Amino acid sequence: MAGIPSALLDAEVILAHTLRKSRTYLHAHGEEPIDARRLEIANARLDLRKDRVPVAYIIGHKEFYGRTFKVNPSVLIPRPESEALIENLKKHWGEKPGKLIDVGTGSGCLGITARLELPLEVTLTDTSRHALTVAQENAKSLNADVALQQSNLLEDVTGVFDIIVANLPYVSRAWERSPETGHEPALALFADDEGLALIMRLIDQTGSHLKNQGLLILEADPAQHMAIGDYAKNRGLSQAAIDGYCLVFSKTNQST
């Protein structure tokens, strides 16, 4: 797998998954023969990795905040940096009950994790029916009681929420995709207006969907934070925190 920096690690993960063993087991039993059928499957999966298909899509899952989430090419692969949204949710909301909506949920990793970590009533939304199917399967496998709704941002959503969390597409269409991200859904990566279009639309929608003193928690490229902060300020949101890729806003007192 020339040209892939993590080739050895990726091969071990794929082989361990195929054999249904741990990587530790592989290291301890390196001389054991491999069943011909298992070897054939492993080699086919390694060929996919040579084509730069992400490991998470090959093995069908990805770890996020200590839990295993199913993924496929209809959803973005959860990133470690997105865990900061959960950490900041805990820090700025605490253990209070409330209503949270995860907009553009994809695999459901943010909303499901929030539901399992805190006493929140959670709704997952996505414009993609296929993504919602994956989120529903993850909610079921992790025993998370959540509601699901297909919606373009909050356009088809009624009611108001204490917390809106969103990892929306924020990559500029001018960005050159890596071989791996070339396999991820463009719908989950790219947005117009240098990556800001969907985030700005969601900020506009907080006026009718976010309660006073409620939180808006977003992920965005740090280079976009100033523009997002200025836009949010003009719409009644005060910046509460910046943490890596995570932005936290609080809604000031006004009519909802």
PLM regions: where:
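Non-catalytic nucleic-acid substrate-recognition regions in nucleic-acid-modifying enzymes
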Residues: 1-7
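Residue-level detector of well-ordered alpha-helical segments, enriched
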Residues: 7-11, 41, 198
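Conserved AdoMet
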Residues: 16-88
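Short alpha-helical
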Residues: 21, 77, 129-130, 197, ...
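Conserved SAM/SAH cofactor-binding pocket of Class I
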Residues: 80-178, 201
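Mobile active-site "lid"/loop adjacent to the S-adenosyl-L-methionine
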Residues: 168-198
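Conserved Class I SAM-dependent methyltransferase catalytic core
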Residues: 194-251
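Flexible, glycine-/basic-rich loop-and-beta segments that form/coincide
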Residues: 253-256
